[in-house]
UniProtKB/Swiss-Prot annotation:
A single GO cellular-component term on record: extracellular matrix
PROSITE patterns: EUKARYOTIC_PORIN
A GO molecular-function descriptor: porin activity
Annotated protein name in UniProt: Mitochondrial outer membrane protein porin
Encoding gene, per UniProt annotation: porA
Entry's Gene Ontology BP terms: regulation of monoatomic ion transmembrane transport
Pfam families per UniProt: Porin_3 (PF01459)
Alphabetical keyword list: Ion transport, Membrane, Mitochondrion, Mitochondrion outer membrane, Porin, Transmembrane, Transmembrane beta strand, Transport
């Protein structure tokens, strides 16, 4: 798991490649109220139906600091909760998590000016920590490390992001322990048309072809857009997104395995409602 602030370094391209591609039939509804909200999700997959409900409560007026808590239960029997409090001191945020599998963690995020630091501790005595630094508007760097109770490093990553122009974003991630290098880029060609891609090279298996994703997005108008992507396994995802308002969003997806076109076609749809 990458701590949130470290993962934010590569978020522009990651979101472009991963978000708004519907491969299942999903209804995500948020009911807002005076003291918080309730999020209900129903996801219909080939393996069955998974439903979850998540009440969220706002404790800001009781604690005097921006804070909230939520509890999630799903039909697979998973129960988990989270409590967040911000600005314990200026720039410091704390997040506590727990679930029915007896996994507990506490995360501290500190973000101020050009520096972001995260420390993530688990009840199994493992840890995850990261440091990100904005050198200037063009360059950012970050390092992330994961270890266990025996003071053994399990993972070390480093990231460099480059924004040479407002319309170009590039990130380079070196996964030292896994011996992998990930290169990603996002290019905004016009106000309507954008392109993105990522490629992962496995240095442990130089004979293996790199894995990749290539995607594009076209804004039809202020409310709708088209997205498409293809990966190294020749899987194609095409998506139509329509925002009827700030409270309603529809995503229609067509997913094709070009290696087996007759049997590799699936469709999906996602509906996001805020009431």
């Amino acid at each position: 798991m990458n701590p949130g602030l470290y993962a934010d370094l590569t978020k522009p391209t990651a979101d472009f490649i991963k978000k708004d591609f519907a491969e299942t039939f999903k209804l995500d509804t948020t009911f807002k109220g005076k003291y918080g909200s309730i999020v209900a999700v129903t996801d219909i997959k080939d393996s069955g139906v998974v439903a979850s409900i998540q009440p969220k409560a706002d404790f800001t007026k009781y604690l005097g600091k921006v804070s909230n808590g939520n509890f999630t239960v799903d039909t697979n029997g998973v129960k988990k909760g989270e409590f967040t409090i911000e600005n314990i001191i200026p720039g410091l945020k704390a997040v506590a998590n727990g679930d029915s599998k007896q996994n507990f963690s506490t995360e501290f995020q500190y973000k101020k000016d050009k520096i972001a630091f995260t420390l993530f501790g688990h009840n199994n005595k493992s840890f995850n920590t990261s440091l990100a630094f904005l050198i200037n508007p063009t360059f950012s760097v970050g390092v992330q490390a994961e270890g266990n109770a025996k003071n053994t490093l399990k993972n070390v990553n480093a990231t460099i992001t480059i924004r040479p122009r407002p319309d170009v974003f590039v990130s380079i991630v070196d996964r030292f322990m896994d011996k992998q290098i990930l290169l990603s880029t996002l290019y905004t060609a016009t106000s309507k048309l954008s392109f993105a891609g990522d490629v992962t090279v496995d240095l442990k298996a130089s004979e293996k072809a790199p894995s990749f994703n290539v995607g594009t997005q076209y804004k039809i108008d202020s409310a709708s857009l088209l997205k498409a992507k293809v990966n190294n396994n020749r899987k194609v995802n095409i998506s139509y997104i329509y925002n009827t308002s700030n409270n309603t969003k529809f995503v229609l997806g067509w997913n094709v395995n070009t290696k087996n076109f007759k049997q590799g076609n699936t469709f999906g749809a996602t509906v996001n409602l805020t009431l």
